[in-house]
Design a protein with these regions (language model features):
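Structural transition elements
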Residues: 213, 333-366, 383-391
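Detector for C-terminal structural segments
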Residues: 30-31, 35, 55, 172, ...
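Gly/Pro-rich hinge or "lid" segments in bacterial periplasmic/extracellular proteins
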Residues: 68-69, 150, 160-161, 171-237, ...
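Ligand-site clamp/hinge motif
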Residues: 201-204, 229-275, 393
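A structural "hinge/loop" feature
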Residues: 38-54, 78-79, 105-108, 172-184, ...
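Aromatic- and charge-enriched surface segment that lines or borders ligand/interaction sites
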Residues: 80-131, 164, 303
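Surface-exposed binding/hinge segments that line
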Residues: 2, 94, 127, 131-191
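N-terminal lobe/hinge region of extracytoplasmic solute-binding protein
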Residues: 34-86, 123, 208-210
Length: 535
């Protein structure tokens, strides 16, 4: 970002704040969420982390269509209705009228949402000549990684309340794609005003949306304060204030939850699950995760450009030991990128067994009989797909040492970690993913396509034509059985080429205080508070 949140410290939005603490006295209509980290920014177009989405796209913004909370069902959002042409290449959206924009000290809207806002929100990502395209770094990982610059031929305004998307080809999951975070709608009027004022980056730092909550204050690594947006077009939130108490340590989050300093927390330590189940003041919600934890090998760096080396590093890791020690019963070993609960999963793929001798043989064939050194990046935050990255890194380090590979564990603050990984500084880096739309297309192309290798969300920087020749046709056809077959073949190719060590799928646990009513675990990993109350 051209002006980083790290440097800006506290974002003062010029609003008079009621003095409040995140400690003992939690007011009746205030909910405190113990979040796991600081967001990278407040424009969901620019980032891919769930931490950022929870702080931006979920409370502040809306999309043309939305996922019904707790499901992957697509429902109307800013668009009341839509039509799709017979050839599947033109989508016409009819906008909801009377949708109000939020405001701040720099901007007071003079109009409601209209088609210009929708066109701007997508043109910024697609059009390199758009004056906002390069603002805040201009990295649109989702949009580019999903191949949308080539898919979307045009986004055009039909009239103030109607927008058309013209595609170059049919795309089966396109409607669901528009419910994803990157497709959030931003205010063109706000953008124009900030551009004229010479401060375009404020659009991404001081967000203006149409969503249920409005940002009041952000203090990096401390807290985010929101208020219910009084002009919200949907059902009004049941709480007046929403506070994100940024708490990276899962044990500290749990301690705060026990003391009622927060009412909802994500990503508990697996070791705490049993105690949470016995705690009379806590409701422990759970469901199978639509997720995966993995370790990407940077295939642009030697010796990881050699498939035998990648296979050797994969054979060398005892995944079952990791599942027991790190996930403690809340995960299962993964052999494919997509989770087994998702359609298109290929159960015929045979996972790499734990076989150090096979690993040594492969290194010998690669001319590395004496081993080599490698950096191993460990995530600084807990995620459902990786509840203890440091412990996992130590176990992988020990396993690799047995075959002569010496690993140095590296970590950074979460935002810096992602920034450096996107730039390809790593040799191996721990990452993970929670599905955004319930479609295999949301796992394979964003994480391992050639387009994603260019924009940074393919942390393996792996571009392999036989893989592309399977995943791209799978996106274009609306023949469901054909899509299943193509995705199954793609999983075989990925398994054989081993651009990443695929580690685990986890069960998602969400501990909430008994006073919290209406909270729903989201299969897509988001944390929604607009329909939540605190008694």
């Amino acid at each position: 970002m051209s002006i980083s949140l790290k440097k800006s410290g506290m974002l003062k939005l010029g609003l008079s704040l009621v003095a409040m603490t995140v400690a003992a006295s939690v007011q009746a209509k205030t909910l405190v969420y113990c979040s796991e980290g600081s967001p990278e920014g407040f424009n969901p177009q620019l980032f891919t982390s769930g931490t950022t989405y929870d702080a931006s796209s979920v409370p502040i913004y809306n999309r043309l269509v939305e996922f019904k909370t707790g499901t992957t069902e697509v429902i109307p959002g800013l668009a009341e209705k839509w039509e799709v042409s017979a050839d599947g290449k033109t989508y016409t959206f009819h906008l909801r009228q009377g949708v109000k924009w939020q405001d701040n000290k720099d901007f007071k809207p003079t109009r409601d949402l209209n088609a210009d806002d929708v066109v701007f929100s997508f043109d910024r990502q697609k059009n390199t000549n758009n004056p906002y395209h390069k603002v805040s770094g201009g990295s649109y990982e989702y949009f580019e990684g999903m191949g949308l610059p080539d898919l979307i031929s045009e986004v055009k305004k039909v009239d103030d309340n109607t927008v058309q998307f013209v595609l170059t080809r049919p795309e089966a999951p396109f409607l669901a794609d528009l419910a994803m975070d990157f497709a959030s709608i931003l205010s063109k009027e706000y953008a124009d005003n900030m551009l004229k004022a010479g401060t375009p980056e404020k659009v991404d730092l001081n967000p203006i949306g149409t969503g249920p909550f409005q940002l009041l204050q952000y203090q990096k690594d401390s807290r985010i304060l929101y208020k219910a947006f009084p002009g919200y077009w949907g059902t009004k939130p049941k709480i007046d204030r929403l506070v994100f108490s940024i708490t990276p340590d899962a044990s500290v989050r749990y301690a705060k939850l026990q003391k009622n300093e927060c009412q909802v927390m994500p990503y508990p330590n697996p070791a705490d699950i049993a105690r949470m189940k016995e705690d009379k003041n806590i409701t422990l919600l759970e469901q199978p995760g639509l997720n995966v934890g993995y370790l990407s090998f940077n295939t642009e760096k030697k010796p990881l450009d050699d498939v035998k080396v990648r296979q050797a590093l994969t054979y060398a890791v005892n995944k079952e030991a990791i599942i027991k020690a790190v996930y403690q019963g809340a995960g299962q070993a993964a052999k494919n990128l997509i989770p087994p609960t998702m359609w298109g999963y290929n159960d015929d793929v045979k996972d790499y067994t734990y076989d150090p001798e096979k690993a040594k043989q492969l290194l010998k064939e690669a001319g590395l009989e004496k081993g080599f050194t490698i950096d191993l990046w460990a995530m600084p935050v807990q995620r459902p797909y990786n509840p203890n990255a440091r412990r996992m890194a130590e176990m992988i380090q020990a396993d690799w040492a047995k075959i002569g590979v010496q690993a140095k564990i590296v970590t950074y603050e979460w935002g810096e970690y992602l920034k450096r990984a996107k730039a390809g500084e790593h040799q191996s880096v721990m990452m993970g993913w929670t599905g955004d739309n319930g479609d295999p297309e949301n796992f394979l192309p964003p994480l391992f396509s050639c387009a994603a290798a260019k924009d940074g969300s393919n942390y393996s920087r792996w571009c392999y034509k036989p893989f592309e020749d399977l995943i791209q046709p799978a996106r274009a056809t609306d023949d469901h059985n054909k899509r299943i077959e193509l995705y199954k073949q793609a999983q075989v190719v990925m398994h054989d080429q081993a651009p990443a060590l695929i580690i685990a799928h986890s069960t998602v646990y969400e501990p909430v205080r008994k006073e919290v009513k209406g909270y729903v675990v989201d299969p897509l990993g988001k944390h929604h508070f607009d329909n939540v109350s605190v008694e």
